[in-house]
Amino acid sequence: QDRWVYIWADGVYSGLRAEQTKLCALVVMGVNERGEKRFLAIEDGVRESTQSWREVLLKLKSRGMNVPELAIGDGAMGFWAALEEVYGETRQQRCWMHKTMNVLNCLPKSVQAKAKQALHAIWQAETKVDAEKAFDLFLETYEPKYPKATLCLHKDREELLAFYDFPAQHWQSIRTSNPIESTFATIRHRTKRSKGCLSRDGMLHMMFKLGQCAQKNWRRLRGFYYLAKVITGVEFKDGIEVTTIDQVAA
């Protein structure tokens, strides 16, 4: 039985010509203690529905999936409420890619380029303290004129900065739900020609099969050897093992 350390979740849409509603595949991907990434679930459902995600997570739990250390995904999903019910001990990391787009959508185009740089300054900071300072600076700069943008950012503050408590070698992978996004960009391209002749079940089955093929070519997670330490509860601060910091200080 594999031990799943990190999981990524997303709702992936693929339009079907025969139906008005778009198929949403609720996707969960995980990385095990050996650094191998796998699809854990590709299920039909409603992205914003807690019930849909609850069913997905309960199915995974019934199959014996352990409590993951960290879950990564977009904030605008029913996934998070379901996760708190089914795997309440799992830490949460909001996807910086989705959050950046959502914040910028609350701003006029004239300030978006500068605001994007300010957002990047947060997650690119080497320490959580520096990230907090950049976070505060963004809020102070844009709150007076654009309160919707700053509220969008501020409401997920803790969950946006969770990655600092995990190995720095993993940051690139755990800051966003890009592992799912990039894979499904390819799958979406492959299923495009078949949309007119597939049912919802047929499309879902095809996505699942293409997903299985895709994962055969995935590389192991960068810095996978740190996963064992994450599992055993080794503490990390600003991406560095706490004992290492203490030894250097001594």
PLM regions and their residue ranges:
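RNase H-like nuclease fold core
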Residues: 1-73, 77, 81-82, 86-89, ...
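Active-site-proximal flexible loops/turns
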Residues: 17, 81, 105, 185-188
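Conserved beta-strand -> loop -> alpha-helix junction used to position metal-binding or nucleic-acid-contacting
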Residues: 70-77, 82-118
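Acidic/histidine-rich catalytic cores and adjacent linkers
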Residues: 121-250
